[in-house]
Amino acid sequence: VKEGFMSQVPETEWPRMRRLRHLAFLVWGLFFLVVVAGGTVRVLEAGMGCPDWPTCYGLLIPPTSEAQLPPDYRVRFAVAGRLAEPFDPLKTWAEYINRLLTVVAGLGVLALVGYVWLRFRRYKRVLLYATAIPAALVAEALLGWQVVATYLAQHLVTLHMIFTLVLTILAFMVAAQTYALRGRELRGNSLWYWRLGWLGWVLLGVQVLLGATLRSWVRDLGVETALESVLFYVHRSFSWVVVGFWAYFHWRVYMDPVRLRFARRWAMVTTILIVTQVFVGAIMSYFSFSGFWKVLHLLLGLLSMNTAYAALYFYKYSEYVHASGSYVFRVA
């Protein structure tokens, strides 16, 4: 029985859809583990901890001491005309663990895509989102290789982060297809608020990119110089613009005449994440620019972009197709 672009799924398939949702959110979580690992690598300046790719010093399992490497290893593993960095086991293993987590996330993606193709390939949208994930993951892996090959070129590092955001949103969209919801027609104020929310999401993305650029300045110029730059003051002041936009959208979600259960939850989480991110940024500016706070700041930025996207999605897709809340998929 079709209802717009939705189609009721037989009751016998409900357990499979619940498994699909859990698997999609598992992959989503694995991507964020990779974000934490990648952020740690960046904070430790361990991006060249393994100077070659996909091996590490030509080995599948990296060494634990410099004595295990050939005497000319810095020349042998030179990158972009530069000698390899002196061996540091902490940096090497941080980068290696980052790569291992990426492989685990890749295996999760294969399981997700295989499950979709095996059980749900007739549902076009869920198939599209699931199939797009490995394509984006391959691009992400190639970018990782280029980041190493170019000795951490800043524009590639930033692009690498953007692809991570794309991957997490694609995983969320696979999970979102398993809810028994259809899009409501947005008119008047509701349409205006929805568009305002998307503008807030774009501004949040700009803020995350400003932060990524500022982190690179800290690395290249030092903390004191970077924190005295115009970019720092723009980044700090712009955070209040983002908070204002999102706080207003959050309030409008709660004031909407339609009871938006999912949108309210995700909007609340987003508000908490953004405010926490501003608080962490203040700690970094005035008290401590330590690695822990930098990783947390980056993680909060990417998490808030995901949860804000979810809130905007469920602001529109908020009507249950059946009062029983049965599971449905998009078929077109």
Question: Where are the regions a protein language model picked out?
Answer:
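Membrane-interfacial loop-to-transmembrane alpha-helix junctions, especially the N-terminal start
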Residues: H22-A24, Y123-I133, W192-G200, R259-T271, ...
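Individual transmembrane alpha-helix segments
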Residues: Y73-L107, H235
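Interfacial helix-loop-helix junctions of multi-pass membrane proteins
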Residues: T40-D52, V138-M161, R215-V230, F279-L303
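Membrane-interfacial catalytic/cofactor-binding modules of polytopic membrane enzymes
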Residues: G205-V243, A247-M255
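Alpha-helical transmembrane segments of multi-pass integral membrane proteins
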Residues: L30, A135-L137, W194-R215, L273
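Hydrophobic cores of alpha-helical transmembrane segments in multi-pass inner/ER membrane proteins
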Residues: A105-L110, T164-Y179, F238-F249, G301-Y317
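N-terminal signal-anchor transmembrane alpha helix
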Residues: L20-G58, L204-L210
